[in-house]
Amino acid sequence: RCLFWSVCP
């Protein structure tokens, strides 16, 4: 789950 910083997936 990529948010406005970089939380993936």
Swiss-Prot record:
The keyword GTP-binding does not apply. Disulfide bonds join 2-8. It comes from Conus pictus (Cone snail). Coiled coil: none annotated. Expressed by the venom duct. It is found in: Secreted. One of its GO terms (cellular component) is extracellular region. It comes from the Eukaryota. This is Conopeptide-pc. Its main location: secreted. GO terms for molecular function: toxin activity. Keywords: Disulfide bond, Secreted, Toxin. The cysteine framework is C-C.
